[in-house]
């Protein structure tokens, strides 16, 4: 974002008209022509990988292949992978916007070989694409190779070095040996690893290149000498002792930053100057009221320090909307936990930049989704399919944060000058500043809210000053911004850094820990306080083998281990068996119950839970001896009810997605014998007609008696490739079970129990629909016997109601409507009588409550149980009875006791003289009642939420009139 974003030193290859879509497609087609399978991008949420918060590299979806635990039906692949780097080692958040090339969300182009080609082909094809196909100047390219590592016992990668010289025209002076930090890749402390070979480009002008050779600037973070492509040669397996063993199969893993490559090929100095970001920047410029960027199609803001914050803000928001929209499209909703909190932090960071720097005070981020989809909806169709949902999710978050953002910024701005004032001061100057802070009533009020550990003003002042002298914002301030105003800590740190201040993170984290401890203590009542003893072995052999998919009874199980569980005065036991038909609670499905028969003695299994690899059966008593065969029998009737509800959940999930959209993802569930509960991502309430449609569609699938198709031990990637639905945030193993009811209707990864055909369910009925969190809805429903009982109960209710109305009408809806009409008529008569009574009271009311203020008659008083409508209707009568030279104020507390109302009247002669206006009076009165109001100069009304203040407010009317007259 400068006056001339074109880089004149790449004109031989640069073509501003070459679109990012063409470049992306050209990369994929180049490798497809060389036998590579074009693979779609994986989700930003890694499938079954609990070690990653977000997908942050192209290799994530192929990790199982490198580890030797998975396979693909192809040995060569090419893709563009959505990536997000916002946490841990790979965290680019702080750099975003402050330079011209870091991003939170980015695309990684890559080509892959799984035991197929190796270094020679990877090097040759990289050169062919960059130089021969895309036309990059060869004399601007540098290659790096691994210099070796004594700690690993590795010599230099002479093979790669020689290949760069033999497969390309690169001279020796532009092939550089680099250390392991730059040129050796490891998946972790152990596992697949190998040397890297990188391609760098020198974009500097000729005079700069002559002055300093490019080889001296490789890998030193020079903005114009940058890495373009990393070729990783995976050929070793790191051992726990630090040694490296050669792999049987050698792999190639390459990664090219798409945004950076587009900038080079379009001849732009910044990735933000490319066509990937231009529509987003222009959309912001069009909406911002700041004159220096409005109307500038090319956004060429003056290059001076004054406008640097504007440039940073534009870049930050353009970057962040991509991360936010793509994350939501992949099922990550902004929240206070895990991945959701990361997205909420990014979103609030963007809103703050827009609000404070671009002066966008209304929700604006959601409006950037449309230009984003226009640019990227083609290769990533999930964006376009979920556009409305993404926009709703973002707007809801914006509106929520904007409610507190302005106040939080005012708080920050009020306190920060005092922090900077104390910086590096002592002695008399410090005493003077303490005095000034003490006199700043607003700042002191804020500090008293922040420093909750003391109410001593001197303690607060001196604690604040001690921290501030070091140029540090106190942790108490940061915590209040977080806890009261919703400021993520990294946003507060960013705002502090803009003022050259640090944040007292130790103090902040102490307060956060204390808050979490309080939350844990408050929920202790809900925590299992059981005293669980260690498992005691009973017999050796295989244990906890689940066979419940195929049978409900195991006649000859053996007890492998037991333990005692004490809860208060209650003692229970948990039993582990060799084989068991009992399903342990998982995936929302409750655990099985049933019996364990030890010879002639039976004990009830009250619950079944999983603990690691163990399946624990809870019983109240434990027979002796335990070393004989045990018959394990599931309560078959209860199991059947659970199966019906679980399969109904799958059918309903499929219909929800079919009806509401692909954005619907499961967020939680309960599958019990008597009901099901299902939480899913969706913003709007599901109306009654839509619920009935979904219900009918599920019942149609039940009537079709669709048979269950079950596939066990399926490689997870194969299952996903078939189109199976994986539940968001669920952790899966490498091999999974797939439950299908018609491949075109419902196919899910699932470990639960199901009916053999949908007809066994019988019936499905919704019970309720509502909201449980922002963007998350909940439905409750019943199936099978429970649904039949629910329908019977509804019919019984209707029958009783029909009996009640039999004398009125044979049609129940018409009878109810007739009663409602009569009720409304009588209510109207009651209202009319009440208002008549109030009107009759006015003469007495005026006589008893009149006072004189500077020759003006002022009448105030209460007419309780009068509504706002009552007061407004009486107001005109009141005014007419008072006549000239009079002011009247009537007050009332509503029937619910929660609100107070006032109506004010001012005679025409007083209005004409300009002495008094009813609207001015109720403005003050409404404010004193905790609300507001308005109206005409002669008649106005107000309301508020502080009914207890009404008498005081009315008593103050004469003084208010006197003040207005003066």
Curated annotation (Swiss-Prot):
Lineage, broadest ranks: Bacteria, Pseudomonadati, Rhodothermota, Rhodothermia, Rhodothermales
Protein name according to UniProt: Alanine--tRNA ligase
Gene: alaS
Keywords for the protein's UniProt record, in alphabetical order: Aminoacyl-tRNA synthetase, ATP-binding, Cytoplasm, Ligase, Metal-binding, Nucleotide-binding, Protein biosynthesis, RNA-binding, tRNA-binding, Zinc
Residue span of region Disordered: 927-949
Domain of life where this protein originates: Bacteria
PANTHER family, per the entry: ALANINE--TRNA LIGASE, CYTOPLASMIC, ALANYL-TRNA SYNTHETASE
Protein family: Belongs to the class-II aminoacyl-tRNA synthetase family.
SMART domains in UniProt: tRNA_SAD (SM00863)
Functional note: Catalyzes the attachment of alanine to tRNA(Ala) in a two-step reaction: alanine is first activated by ATP to form Ala-AMP and then transferred to the acceptor end of tRNA(Ala). Also edits incorrectly charged Ser-tRNA(Ala) and Gly-tRNA(Ala) via its editing domain.
Cofactors, names only: Zn(2+)
GO cellular component: cytoplasm
Catalytic activity, reaction form: tRNA(Ala) + L-alanine + ATP = L-alanyl-tRNA(Ala) + AMP + diphosphate
Gene3D superfamilies: 2.40.30.130, 3.10.310.40, 3.30.54.20, Bira Bifunctional Protein, Domain 2 (3.30.930.10), Threonyl-trna Synthetase, Chain A, domain 2 (3.30.980.10)
Residues binding Zn(2+): 646, 650, 750, 754
Alphabetical list of Pfam families matching this protein: DHHA1, tRNA-synt_2c, tRNA_SAD
GO terms, biological process: alanyl-tRNA aminoacylation
């Amino acid at each position: 974002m400068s006056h001339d974003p074109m880089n004149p030193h790449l004109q031989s290859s640069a073509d501003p008209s070459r679109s990012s879509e063409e470049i992306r497609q050209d990369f994929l087609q180049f490798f497809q022509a060389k036998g590579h399978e074009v693979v779609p991008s994986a989700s930003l949420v890694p499938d079954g990988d609990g070690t990653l918060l977000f997908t942050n590299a192209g290799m994530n979806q192929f990790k199982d292949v490198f580890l030797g635990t998975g396979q693909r039906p192809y040995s060569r692949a090419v893709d563009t992978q959505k990536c997000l780097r916002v946490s841990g080692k790979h965290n680019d958040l702080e750099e975003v916007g402050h330079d011209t090339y870091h991003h939170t969300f980015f695309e990684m182009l890559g080509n892959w070989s799984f035991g197929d080609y190796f270094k020679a082909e990877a090097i040759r094809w990289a050169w062919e694409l960059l130089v021969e196909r895309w036309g990059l100047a060869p004399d601007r390219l540098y290659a790096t190779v691994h210099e070796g590592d004594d700690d690993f016992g590795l010599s230099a990668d002479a093979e790669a070095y020689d290949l760069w010289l033999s497969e390309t025209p690169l001279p020796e002076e532009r092939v550089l040996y680099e250390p392991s930090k730059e040129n050796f890749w490891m998946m972790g402390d152990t596992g697949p690893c190998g040397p890297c070979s990188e391609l760098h480009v020198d974009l500097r002008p000729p005079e700069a290149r002559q002055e300093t050779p490019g080889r001296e600037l490789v890998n030193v973070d020079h903005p114009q000498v940058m890495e373009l492509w990393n070729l990783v040669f995976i050929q070793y397996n790191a051992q726990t002792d630090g040694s490296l063993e050669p792999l049987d199969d050698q792999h190639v893993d390459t990664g090219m930053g798409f945004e950076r490559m587009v900038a080079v090929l379009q001849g732009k100095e910044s990735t933000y100057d490319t066509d990937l970001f231009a529509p987003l920047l222009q959309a912001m410029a069009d909406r911002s009221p700041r004159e220096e960027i409005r109307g500038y199609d090319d956004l060429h803001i003056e290059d001076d320090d004054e406008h640097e914050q504007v440039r940073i803000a534009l870049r930050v928001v353009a970057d962040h909307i991509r991360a936010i929209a793509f994350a939501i499209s992949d099922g990550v909703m902004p929240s206070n936990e895990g991945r959701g909190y990361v997205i909420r932090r990014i979103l609030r960071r963007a809103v703050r930049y827009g609000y404070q720097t671009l002066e966008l005070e209304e929700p604006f981020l959601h409006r950037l989704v449309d230009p984003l989809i226009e640019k990227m909806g083609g290769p990533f169709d999930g964006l376009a399919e979920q556009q409305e949902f993404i926009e709703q999710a973002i707007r809801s978050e914006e509106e929520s944060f904007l409610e507190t953002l302005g106040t939080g910024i005012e708080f920050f701005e009020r306190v920060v000058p005092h922090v900077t004032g104390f910086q590096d001061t002592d002695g008399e100057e410090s005493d003077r500043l303490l005095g000034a802070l003490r006199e700043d009533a607003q700042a002191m009020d804020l500090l008293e809210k922040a420093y909750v550990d003391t109410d001593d003003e001197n303690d607060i002042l001196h604690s604040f000053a001690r921290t501030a002298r070091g140029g540090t914002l106190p942790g108490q301030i940061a915590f209040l911004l977080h806890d009261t105003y919703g400021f993520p800590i990294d946003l507060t740190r960013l705002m502090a850094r803009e003022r050259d201040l640090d944040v007292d993170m130790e103090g902040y984290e102490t307060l956060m820990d204390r808050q979490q401890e309080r939350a844990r203590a408050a929920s202790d009542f809900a925590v299992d306080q059981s005293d669980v003893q260690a498992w005691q072995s009973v017999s050796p052999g295989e244990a906890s083998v689940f066979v419940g998919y195929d049978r409900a009874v195991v006649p000859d199980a053996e007890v492998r281990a037991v333990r005692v569980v004490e809860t208060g005065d209650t003692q229970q036991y948990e039993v582990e068996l060799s084989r068991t038909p009992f399903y342990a609670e998982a995936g929302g499905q409750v655990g099985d119950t049933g019996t364990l028969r030890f010879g002639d003695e039976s004990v009830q299994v009250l619950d079944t839970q999983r603990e690691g690899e163990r399946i624990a059966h809870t019983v109240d008593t434990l027979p002796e001896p335990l070393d004989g065969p045990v018959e394990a029998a599931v309560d078959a009737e209860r199991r059947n009810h659970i199966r019906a509800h679980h399969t109904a959940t799958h059918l309903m999930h499929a219909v929800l997605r079919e009806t509401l959209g692909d954005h619907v993802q499961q967020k939680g569930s309960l599958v019990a014998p008597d009901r099901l509960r299902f939480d899913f991502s969706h913003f709007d309430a599901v109306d009654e007609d839509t619920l009935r449609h979904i219900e009918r569609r599920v019942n149609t699938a039940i009537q079709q008696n669709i048979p269950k198709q079950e596939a066990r031990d399926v490689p997870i990637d194969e299952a996903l490739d078939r189109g199976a639905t994986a539940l968001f945030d669920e952790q899966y193993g490498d091999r999974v079970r797939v439950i299908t009811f018609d491949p075109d209707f419902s196919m899910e990864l699932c470990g639960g129990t199901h009916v053999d055909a949908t007809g066994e369910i019988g019936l499905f009925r919704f019970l309720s629909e509502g909201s449980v969190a922002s963007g998350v809805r909940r439905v409750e429903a019943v199936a099978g016997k429970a649904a039949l009982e629910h329908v019977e109960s509804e019919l019984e209710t209707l029958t009783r109601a029909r009996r009640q109305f039999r004398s009125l009408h044979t049609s129940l809806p018409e009878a109810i409507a007739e009663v409602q009409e009569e009720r409304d008529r009588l209510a109207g008569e009651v209202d009319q009588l009440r208002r008549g009574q109030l009107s009759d009271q006015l003469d007495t009311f005026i006589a008893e409550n009149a006072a004189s203020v500077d020759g003006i008659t002022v009448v105030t008083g209460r007419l309780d149980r009068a509504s706002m409508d009552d007061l407004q209707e009486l107001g005109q009568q009141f005014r007419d009875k008072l006549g000239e030279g009079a002011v009247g104020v009537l007050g009332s507390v509503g029937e619910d006791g929660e609100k107070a109302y006032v109506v004010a009247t001012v005679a025409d002669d007083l209005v004409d003289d300009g002495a008094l206006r009813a609207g001015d009076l109720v403005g003050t009165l409404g404010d004193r009642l905790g609300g507001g109001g308005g109206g005409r100069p002669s008649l106005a009304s107000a309301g508020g939420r502080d009914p207890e203040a009404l008498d005081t407010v009315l008593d103050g009317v004469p003084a208010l009139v006197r003040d207005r007259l003066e």
